[in-house]
From Swiss-Prot:
Taxonomic placement: Bacteria, Pseudomonadati, Pseudomonadota, Gammaproteobacteria, Enterobacterales
Region Disordered: start-end pairs: 70-95
Pfam families: Aminotran_1_2, GntR
Signal peptide: none
Claim: Nucleotide-binding is one of the keywords in the record: no
Conditions for induction: Represses its own expression.
Residues the record lists as N6-(pyridoxal phosphate)lysine modifications: K282
Gene that this polypeptide is encoded by: ptsJ
Protein name in UniProt: Vitamin B6 salvage pathway transcriptional repressor PtsJ
């Protein structure tokens, strides 16, 4: 059934059988030695074909149990709420729409000069502002680039430095969009546990020793748990990463403009390739698809090549709109109020739950994390009967399901938080 004399020919033969349906998900491929004997080729030729199948996501190795055809990706959970739900939606991870800027106020400030092919990809004003903002966040002054959001930046950075099949260390539990991006880009997620102080250094070192070539780290407002790096934890991570200079370090500081937690440096001086990403989605709204990336010069060059091969640049209209918002003194004042409001939501829910003997750590960001001992479905269903739609935590798990609930607090007032706490208590004691 399988034929070919070279690794490419064997790969193409197996691929055609998958397309034709003669090889299906979970079907075992012949042992390397057996197929090599049948085709009268070297075993290394068959092994190379199988390795390419695995890298392409068409097969998976089961170790001593051989190599099997990989099934089509199963449906995955997506970030965002349900606009059609009759329930009070606390599942979406969205900012409060009432706290986003009125963009119409800034349209008159946009440049009337058309931008053409060959123009600088980053607007000069935004470039200068971003360089000042990120100067203290990087080991040395970084090159500034603009992407269509944080996940767009992370995917392009990984594809620039890594190959399909490479392992990437990520927090466990992990942001849904990061999980999905790694999956569809063909990378392998290597889970690293987090606690109230952030990613655990000893678990990260284990992942690096097992072959992870990059790490994606959230320094503040980790999604879904809300944890932020403590100074002690950041120093431990930085010291550990100094021993692995070849590892690509990507810092996803997505909540930088609204975080109530101080910035903690993690990138070591010895790290060869690094990037710090700060997006405006939670600040100006998810529809302003823009993230600012500061990186070392080699990483920036690779990123620009990937941008040039695709979208080339993020619309200068969006860039100018973001710059107008972020340099408006009135909106800066509103940002301060929003930062205090989101932090107060976290504290309020923690105190309200404490009255019922339920302890959670107040986090940072728009989401609260309620850890559970068992699967969250029953608790989420009980809360739904009380009128609340929350996000079940299992979808955020990388190595295993993460038992808990992610609850978006951004739109809740004090009275609603008190009611929610009472309903959580009832759901946990049903």
């Amino acid at each position: 059934m399988i034929d070919g004399k070279t690794a490419n020919e064997i790969f193409d033969s197996i691929r055609q059988h998958i397309i034709a349906g003669t090889l299906r998900a979970e079907d075992s491929l012949p042992p390397v030695r057996e197929l090599a004997s049948e085709l009268k080729v070297n075993r290394n030729t068959v092994a190379a074909a199988y390795k390419r199948l695995i890298t392409a996501g068409l097969a998976q190795s089961l170790g001593r149990n051989g190599t099997v055809i990989k099934g089509s990706p199963s449906p995955v959970a997506l970030e965002g709420g349900d606009p059609h739900t009759p329930l009070h939606d606390l599942s979406g991870g969205n900012p409060d729409p009432q706290r986003l800027p009125d963009l119409s106020r800034y349209f008159a400030r946009l440049s009337r000069t058309p931008h053409l092919y060959g123009d600088a990809p980053v607007s000069p004003e935004l470039h200068a502002w971003a360089a000042r903002w990120l100067r203290d966040a990087t080991p040395v002054a970084g090159e500034i680039d603009i992407t269509s959001g944080a996940i767009d930046a992370i995917e392009r950075l990984l594809c620039a430095h890594l190959l399909p099949g490479d392992s990437v260390a990520v927090e466990d539990p992990c942001f849904l969009s990061s999980i999905n991006m790694l999956r569809y880009a063909g990378f392998s997620a290597s889970p690293v546990s987090v606690d109230s102080e952030g990613m655990q250094p000893e678990k990260l070192e284990r992942a690096l020793n097992q072959g992870a070539r990059a790490v994606i780290l959230t320094p503040r407002a980790h999604n879904p748990t809300g944890c932020s790096l403590s100074a002690r934890r950041a120093a431990a991570l930085q010291n550990m990463l100094a021993r692995y200079p070849q590892v690509v370090v990507i810092i996803d500081d997505h909540f930088a403009l609204l975080s109530s937690s101080p910035w903690q440096p993690v990138i070591a001086q010895t790290t060869q390739h690094w990037a710090v990403i700060r997006s405006v989605s939670k600040t100006l709204g998810p529809d302003l698809r823009l993230a600012i990336v500061a990186s070392d010069s080699a990483t920036s060059a690779k990123l620009r090549l990937r941008l040039n091969a695709g979208s080339q640049w993020v619309s200068h209209l969006l860039q100018d709109l973001v710059y107008a918002c972020l340099t408006d003194p009135e909106y800066q004042h509103r940002l301060t109020q929003t930062r205090l409001f989101y932090a107060a939501r976290q504290q309020k829910l923690a105190r309200a739950l404490q009255q019922y003997g339920i302890a959670i750590s107040p986090g940072d960001g728009v989401n609260a994390w309620l850890p559970l001992d068992t699967h969250s479905q029953a608790t989420a269903f009980t809360l739904a009967k009380s009128g609340w739609l929350v996000r079940e935590g299992e979808a955020f798990g990388v190595s295993a399901p993460s038992h808990g609930l992610r609850i978006t607090l951004s739109t809740l007032n004090d009275s609603e938080i008190n009611t929610l706490a009472a309903d959580i208590h009832q759901a946990l004691n049903r």
